[in-house]
Amino acid sequence: MEQELRISQRAKRYPASGIRKMFDLAAQYPEAIKLTVGEPNFDTPQYIKDAAKRALDEGQTHYAPNAGTTELREAVAAKYRKQYWEGYTKDHVIITVGAMEGLFLAMMTLLDPGDEILVPDPCFPNYYGQASSIGARAVPVPTYEEYDYRIQAADIEKAVTPRTRAILLNSPCNPTGAVLTKEDILAIAKVAKTHDLWVLTDE
């Protein structure tokens, strides 16, 4: 008799992504315009390819520091100093394997089991799975056509409960393409400050 190996309840609860199902369906129609995954419609720039090849030739093929190489973290901090805040240093920067790892680490750091994180609805479905896998809950906040599907501070305010710990913003939003305005962000920041909430951004 064949024995069935046990898997965790967490794995059983993890919601399946509809994106891959749609991806497979769209593959049956060559003329379809695929909006299933957030992948650029252009090739990797040559200077990035050249840098990757150069790194291989120079033997940069071993474990890097957990937070990323010092040079890269310093370069990111310099860019952010120009764009956002002059106080950024490499100590504010962690290099992750894509945005999803970064968001997952942030959720693990900021949320306890039973906590809530507010997400725009519709949103990238992995947000629900990531929150669920650490025992937290992603709470959908509806977005509306009249605001071009940009999540609004007033709707976030309505969704806040005593268990709310964070707001997750996605701009440009996957899947709606909505881009938050400066006014949107300032209004959301006010709600976050009022309720002492963290704000995570997936950009």
Q: Model-derived features: where do they sit?
A:
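Aromatic/hydrophobic pocket-lining residues that form π-stacking "cages" and hydrophobic walls in ligand
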Residues: 22, 127, 188
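Helix C-cap/helix->beta junction micro-motif
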Residues: 29, 134, 194-195
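A short helix-loop-beta submotif of the ANL/AMP-binding
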Residues: 132-139
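Active-site phosphate-binding strand-loop segment of PLP-dependent enzymes
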Residues: 139, 144-203
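Conserved PLP-anchoring active-site segment centered on the Schiff-base-forming lysine
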Residues: 109-131
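N-terminal small-domain helix-loop-helix segment of the aminotransferase-like
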Residues: 2, 9-98, 105
